[in-house]
Amino acid sequence: YRYSTGLSFIYPDYHPAATSGDSLRLLFEFNTSDLLFVNNDSAATGSYAISFALYKDMESKLIVDSGVRYFTCSKPLEEGFRLRGAIDVVAPDSFNYFMRLDFSDLNRNQAVTDIIIIDRTGIQSPDKFLLVDAYTNAPLIRNFSDRPTNVRIVQNSDTKRPVFMRYFKTDYPIADP
């Protein structure tokens, strides 16, 4: 879910990835053309911040973990470059969480709020698996790809268990999973 108080120019994508029993790595990605870059002494730089608050459930007022991370980046040479990063969060296993994320462009003084649900229950939780590009090993954070991509499914957690998948191929004209 995404919320903005006015016209929004920022469209970040997030993906929670469980790393161990009490740790979660929040992967984020956005297009650098969404940021406002200002000229400093030698180069154009963009500044942004991501603040987060992790709640036990939607109606809870108890915050499990929270924080703000500040970032600065130089303007890339190519247009449409997607910048990636990660934030480590404390999220004990066996709960479903509700996370509020505020992505702020500090040069433009504009923010957009996203809300994501994090599933940390069961051994087949979707947050314990990550889809990566087979050639570059870069995580695929968005739910779609703009080009044909070979992918691998990797398990994020420390314990290595077999992964069971069901794959359906039908003649109905729907894209394969």
Where are these regions (language model features)?
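Intrinsically disordered, low-complexity terminal regions enriched in Ser/Thr/Pro/Gly
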Residues: 1-177
